[in-house]
A protein has these predicted regions:
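Short glycine-enriched loops at secondary-structure junctions
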Residues: 16-18, 63-64, 88, 111-112
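Short beta-strand segments at enzyme active-site cores
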Residues: 15, 55-62
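Short glycine-enriched, charge-decorated loop/helix-capping segments at active-site entrances
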Residues: 27-36, 76-82
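Acidic, proline/glycine-rich short linear motifs
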Residues: 65-75
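A short, N-terminal amphipathic alpha-helix
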Residues: 38-56
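Acidic-leg catalytic submotif of subtilisin-like serine proteases
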Residues: 11-21
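Short acidic/His/Gly/Ser-rich catalytic and metal-binding motifs that mark active-site loops
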Residues: 20-25, 67-69
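Active-site-adjacent betaalpha module
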Residues: 1-11, 48-53, 77-201
């Protein structure tokens, strides 16, 4: 059954668009598909649109302690040490997103924004029904946040122009997996902008 793009109240969830995504490097601690930075920068259009429509914007930031004590099993796969508290590249990408200290910010230690955070308390306080997801990685933090949102009975949408994965193949597979859970989950930026404008006060 396909629902409306926005059911009830929406929030834009900006996942892990952090300063390091916009630093040119030969090697990265986490693999990125081509055009990763460009896709992250495009999220600013969605952020501006949400603000103009009165839709709350919630930034998610992955951050780890410098002694690595909270990584758990996260380093057992393809990822190397990343997002340390004392690294400037871990900060939210202020210039590219327009983030301000007045914005909602959830810091997480795991892939899902729901796991071990007060994200759901914030969503309940805002009376949110629909999560509009952008950021990265499509196949990791976006996917797992989507799944936990789905299992918590939120309507979940992923803005496919504004997410990027560890590879093109992983990105596409994650988008298909999310669409499997909720028909109509994959949405273009243009579609989301139109829906947000329709919900403006």
């Amino acid at each position: 059954m396909q629902r409306q793009l926005i059911e009830g109240r929406a929030a834009l969830i900006v996942i892990d668009i952090q300063a390091g995504a916009f630093v040119e490097k030969d090697e990265r601690s986490i693999p990125h598909m081509p055009d990763y930075a460009e896709r992250m920068a495009l999220a600013k259009t969605a952020i501006d649109g949400a603000r103009a429509s009165g839709i709350p914007v919630i930034f998610i930031q992955e951050v780890h302690r410098p002694d690595l004590v909270d990584f758990g099993r996260e380093l057992d796969g393809d990822e190397d040490v990343h997002c340390l508290e004392d690294n400037p590249e871990t900060a939210i990408a202020v210039e590219q997103t327009g983030f301000t200290p007045r914005d909602y910010l959830i810091k997480k230690r795991r892939y899902s924004a729901f796991f071990g955070t007060d994200f759901e308390i914030l969503l309940r306080g805002l009376r949110v029904d629909t999560l509009l997801l952008c950021g990265g990685l499509t196949d990791v933090c976006v996917h797992y946040t989507f799944v936990d949102g789905h299992q918590s009975d939120y309507f979940c949408r992923v803005i496919e122009d504004c997410v990027a994965g560890s590879s093109i193949e992983a990105h596409e597979a994650a988008l298909r997996a999310m669409e499997y859970l909720q028909t109509g989950a994959r949405r273009s930026l243009d579609e989301v902008m139109t829906a947000m404008k329709a919900h403006a006060p």
